[in-house]
């Protein structure tokens, strides 16, 4: 299995990370940057540009440069937010045949999922260049307030990009994973995530590997793009007052204004004044016109104050839903580039009554969390499990790779169900509980959700320990998975809430797949033990035949080779009975080979003993040849 990568598919920038051993690592792109602009463009000759190259040419090619397309993903054309977006961007937003909002360039239309897929492909290529291996699986993050259509559209983007999306997880939850993975101290945190296009706030309780989402709230159309556009509007208004020219009618000028606004916004986070200087922004009959303007931090904050204030109400709602006061929040984690703005930090401090935590990189923390979740799914990271309530069966992997259901699909929640399992080997002191979701008989054919270990089982014969595995789903959709050794009372459990998951299409596909393959699954299940035993016998017989075949009579040797060939052929299929029959035939035929091996060993031992008896002690004289050595010049 190749590496599973974690991708933060952002409105303004995207980021990719991967687990490097036990540590998540952000991967630099071909341009040497740790984040990639979420921009796709088509040049005059039809070449597709993604990331920094697309951003560099945006000013001269505004109508074919798509940015902030994440705001359109999963939205209908008649959505009020789409109507608002149409007035803000220089590229064309059109109505698709299915009623969705798509984008258009040179008479070609693209779905937002398709444009997002181009960005995901760039992330995929970045990871492959770093790892030196093919990558085809990923965990992708989405805003916590994304609806089902938006989540599914994001998953579709992954598929178009050639990625199997193992999990869609919430951005604040991913950030909490990155923040809290190595924190020993339990507590309640708030994740305040103000990114390029969306705002989310989540309240989480963290402790002992448990990441429990208490509440979430947000706005999927509030972010850095709105701050940029507010400044663009101000610059256009000021220029019109001075020069009498409306720059909004000039798409090229508008794109230059947007770039300048973004740059000024970033600069004003670290300085109190900046200058915007755009020579030759436009021209009239009197000649070229230039835009030069000083902008103070105070003026910018006044322009966007209502946008910052819009983040307060979702925070209050999230606190109320969690049943907590601002004073009960132990730490406020800032996520998203916009949280670098001093005004935003000030509002957060006033609201929660404490300085926000600035120990994580707001541009990278979400991708890092996605990489951690990818590590969980791969088994590289343990004691962390993000679970959603699902209409598919929940169970664990047992001996032979079999999927043993504990809670069947369509079980009404809240529910709690336990099942007792045992060890597979003598003196086994630990068991790994691998949790799966699906309808197939073999665990590998289902979706792995995570794993954890139950340690400290007293040494005893296999099959003797009684390990009770319990799945507990409450009315809030929070899943508890625990394993308890009934003899010692030792227990290990994980509880996590996340709101990603499988779409209806995925569920339908898995159920239909299970129905179609039911008979085959049953045969494969029965064949597991038979195949394991047969494989071991084939290997040992081949080795013995190569070493001792000459000691066996020709007819017996031929019988062994025929039986070996028959069993190899049977192993190509999944007929358990045929494999068992051929295994028995080979076992009988190879008995003569075993006799020859024992006979040869006995003869070798006898020869060794005889040689020992024939050893004669001898005297020897040491000769020093140095005296006779001739020296030459």
UniProtKB/Swiss-Prot annotation:
Signal peptide: none annotated. The modification Phosphothreonine is found at residue 198. InterPro entries: ATPase_NBD, Chaperone_DnaK, Heat_shock_70_CS, HSP70_C_sf, HSP70_peptide-bd_sf, Hsp_70_fam. The keyword Cell membrane does not apply. One of its GO terms (molecular function) is ATP-dependent protein folding chaperone. The keyword ATP-binding applies. Keywords: ATP-binding, Chaperone, Nucleotide-binding, Phosphoprotein, Stress response. Induction: By stress conditions e.g. heat shock. Disulfide bonds: none annotated. Pfam families: HSP70 (PF00012). It comes from the Bacteria. Belongs to the heat shock protein 70 family. Acts as a chaperone. This is Chaperone protein DnaK. The gene is dnaK.
